[in-house]
Amino acid sequence: MAGETTKVVIVTGGSSGIGRCTASALKENGCSVYEFSRRNIPMDGVTHLSVDVTDEDAVHAAVQQVLQKETKIDAVINCAGFGISGAVEFTSMEQAKAQFDVNFFGTVAVNKAVLPFMRRQGKGHIVNISSVAAVAHIPFQTFYSASKAAVSSYSYALANEVKPYGIHVTVVELGDICTGFTKARQKSILGDAEYGGRISRSVSQMEHDEQNGMDPAAIGRYIADIVEKTKPAVVYVAGAQYKFLSLLCKLLPAAARGRIVGKLYG
């Protein structure tokens, strides 16, 4: 059991990528960390619980396991997610639903499991990991962009719902990061000929940007430090160029925004 001053934090998707780096950074900050993922890749000082975030019963059971060991849950960081790419026309409904089941509804399931306890304890911090793709709508990564836009909109609204109970909600919009996310992406170039080779060119550009992206360990520390804030903001964007891009996309008319993103990825 964690001490009175030790923060108890749940991290989803903690077996790899941003989730793993965040769990490691939280541990270094002195937190008691519980990592929810399907794979158990041991990490010193971090407790793994086998959880598929698309299984609501499993999520609830895992949260109850944490509560059996601890007297509190200070924060939850929802990192679990994956990406698909391809033309909307050639993406099956099953693939599209799977993208939302993990990226959006998985986040919702974890938050639903912890919110009653946080509300009763009168405090807590929910951190949902989104993407600048939520505002820079990337062609041939349409369902990923849409799932992250859903996470961002959900976070803004939830923040107002739970604010009276001392619960903070933060959404972190990330840019390109060099992790295994690129290799794990479910890619499809079906219809590339019909689309004039644009699908393969767009995916190639995405992969290049990701492989030359930000250091995941630095991003893990960035997210872990947000948990330490007494008055966290509702939204953070990591990286100067992504802050600029996010602001630009929010200020520009839709047509101008579309032309810029289309030149980069279309």
Residue ranges, per PLM feature:
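Conserved NAD(P)H cofactor-binding loop of Rossmann-fold oxidoreductase domains
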Residues: 79-84
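SDR active-site lid
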Residues: 164-233
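Rossmann-fold cofactor-recognition segment
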Residues: 44-57
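Active-site helix of classical SDR
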Residues: 111, 147-150
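Substrate-binding pocket helix/loop in short-chain dehydrogenase/reductase
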Residues: 87-88, 95-97
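N-terminal Rossmann NAD(P)H-binding glycine-rich loop of SDR-like oxidoreductase domains
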Residues: 15, 23
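Residue(s) in the substrate-gating loop at a strand-loop-helix junction
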Residues: 131
